[in-house]
């Protein structure tokens, strides 16, 4: 288990900056990220992914406005929405990782952001969405992406469930330790406060 955690950390530190796979890899080893030294690379990766996605959306809008001459920057096209959904989720991830503690919904946001990117790629490349941005000519090309999406969804949900179980065990253990420590403190003070016989003379 420790080897897998260290591998997840190395992927976060040494991976490519332009992919949402890095936050997902961090999610796989998120139960080890407890210090500020480990959380700082996470913030950098998520911000970098968010900036790349933002620049991509802006360049796509500029290209559509100047090259296609539609007379507007944004038309809520299905393909535009497919890129906008991961951007909204990535924005939520940025706000969630600012907190000093790791929460289950932070892990869930990272998982859903990556899965939305895969699902958006599948929708565009398979021709499932009818859009002027879609240049798919072969519907069978999306089969691989669909199976990859299902596989990653299953693995991510299993990891998320295991992490939630580990987090609940740690919270229960901490509560039990607090109660036990408080009980010991009360017993110690009670022992000190017990009446003791007073010696009026010495033998």
Curated annotation (Swiss-Prot):
Keywords: Cytochrome c-type biogenesis, Membrane, Mitochondrion, Mitochondrion inner membrane, Transmembrane, Transmembrane helix. The chain crosses the membrane at residues 44-64, 143-163. GO terms for cellular component: mitochondrial inner membrane. One of its GO terms (biological process) is cytochrome complex assembly. It is a multi-pass membrane protein. GO terms for molecular function: heme binding; heme transmembrane transporter activity. Its main location: mitochondrion. InterPro entries: Cyt_c_assembly, Cyt_c_biogenesis, Cyt_c_biogenesis_plant. It is found in: Mitochondrion inner membrane. A stretch of 270 kb of the mitochondrial genome is duplicated within the centromere of chromosome 2 resulting in the duplication of the gene. The expression of this duplicated gene (At2g07768) is not demonstrated. It is also probably not RNA edited and therefore differs in all the positions known to be edited. Interacts with CCMFC, CCMFN1, CCMH and CYTC-1. Belongs to the CcmF/CycK/Ccl1/NrfE/CcsA family. Forms a complex with CCMFC, CCMFN1 and CCMH that performs the assembly of heme with c-type apocytochromes in mitochondria. This is Cytochrome c biogenesis CcmF N-terminal-like mitochondrial protein 2. The lineage of its organism: Eukaryota, Viridiplantae, Streptophyta, Embryophyta, Tracheophyta.
């Amino acid at each position: 288990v420790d080897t897998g955690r260290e591998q997840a950390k190395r992927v976060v530190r040494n991976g490519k900056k332009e992919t949402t796979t890095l936050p997902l890899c961090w999610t796989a080893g998120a139960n080890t990220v407890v210090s500020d030294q480990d959380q700082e690379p996470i913030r950098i990766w998520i911000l970098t992914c968010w900036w790349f996605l933002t620049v991509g959306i802006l360049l796509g809008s500029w290209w559509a406005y100047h090259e296609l001459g539609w007379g507007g920057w944004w038309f809520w096209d299905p393909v535009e929405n497919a890129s906008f959904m991961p951007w909204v989720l990535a924005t939520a991830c940025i706000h969630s990782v600012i907190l000093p503690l790791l929460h289950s919904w932070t892990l869930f946001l990272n998982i859903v952001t990556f899965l939305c990117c895969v699902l958006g790629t599948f929708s565009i490349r398979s021709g499932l969405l009818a859009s002027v941005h879609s240049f798919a000519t072969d519907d069978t090309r999306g089969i691989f992406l669909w199976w990859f999406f299902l596989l990653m969804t299953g693995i991510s949900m299993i990891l998320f469930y295991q992490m939630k179980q580990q987090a609940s065990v740690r919270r229960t253990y901490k509560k039990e330790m607090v109660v036990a420590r408080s009980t010991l403190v009360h017993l110690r003070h009670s022992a000190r406060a017990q009446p003791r016989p007073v010696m009026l003379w010495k033998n």
